[in-house]
Amino acid sequence: VFSLEFFPGFKYNTYYNNIPSKARKGGKIMLNEYQKKLFKEVANTIRGLSIDGVQKANSGHPGLPLGCGEIGAVLWGAFLNYDPSDEEAIWRDHFILSAGHGSMFLYSALHLAGYNLSIDDLKKFRQRGSKTPGHPEKLDTEGVEVTTGPLGQGVANAVGIALGMKILGEMYNKDGFPIFENKVVVLAGDGCLMEGISHEASSFAGHLCLNNLILLYDRNHITLDGAFSDSCSDDVVMRYKSYGFDVVEIEDGNSVEQVYDALMRIKEAQEKPLLVVCNTVIGFGSPHKAGTHNVHGSPLGEEEVLATKRALGISEEKFFVPAGVKEFFNERKELMKKKKIHFEDMFSNYQKSYQALAAEIKKLKDHSIPHALKKALQHLSFEEKVAGRKC
């Protein structure tokens, strides 16, 4: 029997701890100087790969990848649980890029994280038949959770996935066996949160108190053809508070330290759906286009690409990944392997105690219909004409 009842007393307790090392100062989770430098290098590598991909294609959106480099570095470098060898791993966290036009941000991060995306694939951005289409496609690219592009759609996708994880948790989690305790993280921009679909989905998430949902709001105050203030005067923070979200604001979304501190605090405890306001600069690092709508959806141009790399202090070599970044993500992959083994050991013990439930979970992972559901569907009957709302 499938139940969609919501349990308001349910508390989310994170099962995994991704913090490479942490110290506290004034209540903050701190990075040491080496870690600051390393995460900044990861952020700039995401930027470099992204603007090179857009420039080679002579088409795309460099603004978001440049503006969200630190967010990407902390997500894949510390926060998210993922398994490049199994994109449907039960224990993984889910990342959705609602602002799908910024797809080179996602492709660059997936490449660094060890997914089946090579440098050659990045070089084929927006080319027919490539693994790197202009907007993320679920069936084309390993590591892409859902197809996105229409602004705001990814927010609704994320709410649906978060609800799905909650339902699975209520069905299958047992004391000592937190099989489904996944975080669902969605990155959305000003344009996404102007769309009606994001309003409706967010309201629903707040109503259900989906405390596994994290909405990262890339607030750069820029839209496709001008300033956000030209077409919208919503108080987004107050709107989300009215939905029932908790709100955290990162004053400088281009600060590794601030992004890390905010996200790792969330990892420790979350009681409601969460809006994380990341105040970023669109096109960060571009000397002549940063902070303007001109960097949103057009290649920088060869001269500006070079100027941006010089301003960021990174190699001018195209599609360059520093050795230190490669080593960091190799170590990260080893950590993820240990977490995979940890989960598999737990699931093995779960299977001994809950054999039938474990079998159902395996079928779900393999996209098979559970026997109970198949049997229930076979016995459904309808009158000849029934309104859809009554089915």
Give the location of each predicted region.
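Short, Lys/Arg-enriched N-terminal segments with co-localized hydrophobic residues
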Residues: V1-I29
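Prokaryotic Sec-type signal peptides and long signal-anchor helices
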Residues: F6, F10-T14, G244, K333, ...
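Intrinsically disordered, low-complexity segments enriched in small/polar residues
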Residues: F7, R24-K25, T132, G283, ...
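Intrinsically disordered, low-complexity serine/threonine-rich segments
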Residues: F7, Y15, G301, A307-A311, ...
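Thiamine diphosphate
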Residues: I29-K183, K326-E327, E331-C391
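Glycine-rich ThDP/TPP pyrophosphate-binding loop and its adjacent helix/strand module
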Residues: P84-S85, E137-R332
